[in-house]
């Protein structure tokens, strides 16, 4: 959702100020995110990654509060509404959006299901950067302005790096459990020590890229001042990632997610100056 907010701000700054498709883009992003989350919970439950001994937050499936049948119905409902909202966006973006919309919904499933689930084969970070950063920002911007440029792709990549912070926290917390269930993540390959450094540098790189994709909107000094809160906050969260262990890391999930919102709001504020 933060990605789309950021894209809308950039599009409005460049003349793409149409609120109806902007709101529909937000709705589509929320539905796609919800679909991905529910499918991921279902997949982790089926594989055994989520169980009564898991370090992560309590899951309704594991506790028995929600049945498999209910989850499947929820997935069907979410996908159906998501598809309809996506179809409505074709009015503004053209039929070229259809294959990409279907791809987004497909990735929501392939992220944790299928013969080669992305999150189980060290491709989770790549998927997050692409489909929670580059794709939503690029196509929201395209729908509103009818153009794509390198600046907006850089903006999408930067947001993808920030959104990836949440996945890194998850994978650091579940490093031992993931190995037990043959779930291969970047933490499993490179080690938590290395990925904690990536966690620190992701938002720094994202803010650095801002000097490029915001150059037509503000001067370097304005952007340098604007990103100070983001930089301070991300360093604080990074320190906590190195300090917290086990279930303590659950407290960082919301804090890591907040980085994306802060980054998006930073862009929004600068565009309003």
Please annotate each region the language model reported.
Residues 1-7, 126-141, 188-192, 253-267:
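Small-residue-rich segments of transmembrane alpha-helices in multi-pass membrane proteins
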Residues 6, 10, 15-39, 98-106, ...:
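Membrane-embedded alpha-helical segments that form the functional core of polytopic membrane enzymes
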Residues 28-55, 165-187:
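Acidic (Asp/Glu-rich) catalytic motifs at the cytosolic membrane interface
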Residues 37-41, 106-119, 167, 171, ...:
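C-terminal ends of transmembrane helices
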Residues 57-150:
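Intramembrane alpha-helical segments
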